[in-house]
Amino acid sequence: MSDEKLVPKLRFNGFDEEWNEVQISDIANVVGGGTPKTEIENYWNGDIKWFTPSEIGKTKYIHDSERHITEEGLNNSSAKLLPKNTLLLSSRATVGEISIALSECTTNQGFQSLITKNNVDNEFIYYLISTIKNEFLRRSSGSTFLEISKNEINKIKINIPTLSEQKRISELLSAIDNKIELLDSKHENYQNFKKYLMRQIFAQKLRFDFKMFKLKELSKINKGKQLNKDDMLENGKYYVLNGGKEPSGYTNEWNTLENTITISEGGNSCGFVNFNEEKFWSGGHCYYLSNLSKNVDDYYLFSYLKFIEPKIMRLRVGSGLPNIQKGDIENIKIKILPMNEQLKISNLLLSMDKKVNSIAIQKENIKIFKKGLLQQMFV
């Protein structure tokens, strides 16, 4: 029998008591949901929020639902009216996803929600549940989709400290979440402002003298070389860019120079425009631009192509695996300004992109820090 104490690796000063092992049934009432009959109009479009699993887990708190039911629908179904601060826990398909309800609500039958008792901090349990998602999945069953029963959830064992320590932990993690949310907002605001600037510049709301050129008059359009999955590495020096928005793998060889514009040739993301700041391997479903004309700045051209990206994506043909023909790419029309204006625009948009990327890196670092805390502050 182990003498190891039930304590976390990392905890606040002043707390030294051992944590207690309990079942979820000891700290919360588990409540299922239901769906009123959809063919009865009087059951729907009322004032009572009614959540489905697809709406849960994206954010810590959830306020409103996509659909609403009436009191008559509530009374004539197995849906239950849940109080504010209920932990909405998905028990079907996306098992273990969780959000906190900011107001009274109901759910469909894809939930086993937790109404916590007086001896626990609601937000602490929210964070704790996020650390044991694998336990929910392990206890789930089903052939069409996974599902975990109320009985199985009740039996899950968790470790909790005193209420005061629970609150200290949840306060810290909440502060970190607030910082992430603030960075999310800043990231979105900068992106929206950049889009606004691009509309003003490229939609000619700001007046410039310009000439129209076909893309093939400004650069050579090349198609990359296919690299088989067996030839890719998990941690190679150079990324492999194919038809998607993200690298499809890595390799220790490169075939395309840094500061190169690419356009996805095939797949669901065909038409996606990217600016590659380092050497990479251009794959078989990737167009890359080379031999740019002296009349165009590379980042200006990228920014203009990014602005018209929705139009480029509409050039796709084929239904199974859509693609964009090279001839259609070559004939894309580009608005070219005098070089001094191009450089001003490039510098402005590049500074915006650097700010957006800096915020994204900050956010990712905080998420990594939070993940480390979750691993060390819970038992």
Report the location of each language-model feature.
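Amphipathic alpha-helical coiled-coil/heptad-repeat segments
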Residues: 1-23, 155, 159-214, 331-379
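A short beta-sheet element
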Residues: 34, 46-47, 52-54, 61-130, ...
